[in-house]
Each structure stands twice: as structure tokens, then as C-alpha cells.
Amino acid sequence: MRIIMFTPLSDAAKVLPATSFLDAHIECLPAVPSSYATAADADVVLLDARGDLVRARALCQLLTGPMSCGPVMLVLEEGGAAVVQADWGAADFVLAGATPAELSARLRLVRRVAQAPLPVDEDRIEVGDLVIDTTAYTARIRGSIIDLTYKEFE
């Protein structure tokens, strides 16, 4: 398993002590634009979010949005867990004081969920906010039904 951790520190064990018991090597990189491209081929990306939560949120959204890297797991202090929202794009989070067993289980689960194929619905066409259901003859934009005649739908 290839794990990358974005952190200003050079040792992952200083951020998350449980990493020293993992059988996978963790590559620590600074959170600078020149290192973001390496996250694309990582199985899991750990993001040190113990300090600057605003910057961590922006980086998490970048990695899971335009960068389209593997699943991102935030490393937080206990107080930071209250701030994290779904719009950050993180797959999971772990507290800095997590045990090796908890960290290992979370990494396995996050990786497994990321590898699960999404079901393909061949009767639905999605382009941005527009969703067309060819079997129900409906079209929606941002969730609102568009009133189309049969000819317009075709």
C-alpha cells in the first residue's frame, strides 16, 4: 500500500505515532503545489490537519476535487473533529492519538471503499447539474424536473 502524508514534518510518527507500527512505508511530503502531483498514484493520502484547519480544508478539497487523487484521511487533534464537514471531501479522519489497530483498520476500510466500483445506470445520463432518465422520460436540472414534451425529450 502506497501512503503519502502531507505534513511539514519529515517523520510520520511525529504526526501520528501509530504509523510506526504499520507495515507500509509512509512518504512525508510538504503541502506545496510541487508535491501535489505525487498524490495521484497513492493508495491513501494522509493530511496533517492538526494545526491550520483552514489550509487543511482547502488542500483536502483540492486533492479530492480537481486533483482526483486516492482517498484522503485527515489526521486531527480532538478539537478539530468538531469542525470537519462533508464538503471537505475527506474519506475519513483519524485522531493523532489513535492506536495502531484503529489506524490499520481505518486505512483498510478507506482503501476498500475507494476501490469499490460505482454501479453504472445505463438509463441515466448525467452532465453537470443535468440528469436525464431515459426510461422514465424525465429530465432534471439541479433536482428540479424540466417539463418537456415527448418530442423535446427525444
Question: Which residues are covered by each model-predicted region?
Answer:
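Active-site regions of enzymes building and remodeling cell-envelope glycoconjugates
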Residues: 22-28, 43, 89-95
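Basic, amphipathic DNA-recognition helix from helix-turn-helix-like DNA-binding domains
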Residues: 64, 68-126
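Small/polar loops that bind or transfer phosphate-bearing groups
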Residues: 7, 48, 95, 148
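Conserved phosphotransfer microenvironments
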Residues: 8-14, 23, 30-72, 76-83
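Extreme N-terminal starter segment of soluble prokaryotic enzymes
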Residues: 1-4
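Short, Lys/Arg-enriched segments at the junction into DNA-binding effector domains
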Residues: 112-151
